[in-house]
Regions:
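M16/insulysin-pitrilysin zinc metalloprotease superfamily fold
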Residues: 40-57, 109, 124-181, 201, ...
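Short, conserved charged micro-motifs
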Residues: 31-38, 91-94, 142-147, 244-246
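C-terminal structured "cap/appendage" subdomains that terminate the fold
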Residues: 195-227
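Bilobed periplasmic-binding protein-like "clamshell/Venus-flytrap" ligand-binding domains
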Residues: 20, 219-238
Length: 258
């Protein structure tokens, strides 16, 4: 290392590993906490001295770039992903998205991507910060799966479920939310809530929205999902010949193992 880069490295360490930046998550019996607290105090003493420059924790500004990449390999299947962010388009998180995940996973995506399409599986997720994705894995298709994703808004516009069907979806959603957790999992959940700035009221609101959801709430997600898909963010890992034959779907193709 040059002297300037070495000095920069030291400066970074001295501004990162300071008491103000330390977060500790402890999961233990109350009787054991005193011993843990002593270890935390010891660690604090061995960090770099405070420079009094830490005002608040914030993420660095990220400059996102749409690439629509296809990564080619020798496999005979694809992993097809579409992603986007609904918050960027003015939408907010709603507990009905929890139910949508169940509906997609056991109905629309499962039937079209897994059963009819022959993929090994499929996933979907809707995060509080707006990040959303739809993914297939070990999928013999590419463009067909992408078109299935594009069909989600129309599926939602036409969605109908009677009280019995909605109750089934709600029970499936709540069972996922109420999965039994060991102490470690509870600690991880609490840490995540702290880092995300989630209060108990936020979690209760989500639960109330799930329990009180109707098929109208599911139909109401159409525009939110459409906003994500309209971003046309695509990433695929799959067979070289398949990707090259459908290269118009991508902005760039790369060998996966380069």
């Amino acid at each position: 290392l040059s002297s300037s880069s070495a000095a920069s490295d030291v400066y970074k360490r001295q501004t990162i590993f300071v008491p103000e930046r330390m977060i500790v998550s402890v999961v233990c019996e109350e009787a054991d906490y005193q011993a843990v607290e002593a270890q935390i105090a010891f660690l604090l003493k061995n960090l770099y001295p405070s420079k009094k420059i830490v005002k608040e924790r914030s993420l660095p500004e990220l400059h996102l770039e749409k690439k629509n990449e296809g990564f080619m390999d020798a496999s005979q299947v694809q992993y097809v992903a579409r992603a986007g962010n609904y918050v960027r388009h003015g939408f907010s998180y709603h507990g009905a998205l929890r139910i949508l995940k169940v509906i997609m996973g056991y109905d629309y995506l499962w039937i079209n991507v897994r059963v009819k399409g022959g993929a090994y599986g499929c996933m979907n997720s809707y995060m509080r910060n707006g990040d959303t994705y739809f993914v297939s894995y070990r999928d013999p298709n590419l463009k067909k799966t992408d078109e299935i994703y594009d069909g989600i808004p129309q599926y939602l516009a036409d969605f109908k479920a009677d009280e019995r069907e909605m109750t089934k979806y709600i029970i499936g959603t709540i069972s996922d939310m109420d999965t039994p957790m060991n102490p470690s999992a509870k600690g991880a959940r609490s840490m995540t809530a702290y880092l995300q700035g989630l209060a108990f009221a936020d979690i209760q609101k989500e639960r109330d929205q799930v329990i009180g959801a109707t098929d109208e709430d599911i139909r109401g997600l159409k525009d939110l999902i459409a906003s994500v898909l309209e971003e046309k963010n695509l990433c695929v890992i799959g067979n070289e010949d398949n990707l090259k034959s459908q290269s118009d779907m991508f902005m760039q193709l790369k060998n996966l193992y380069e």
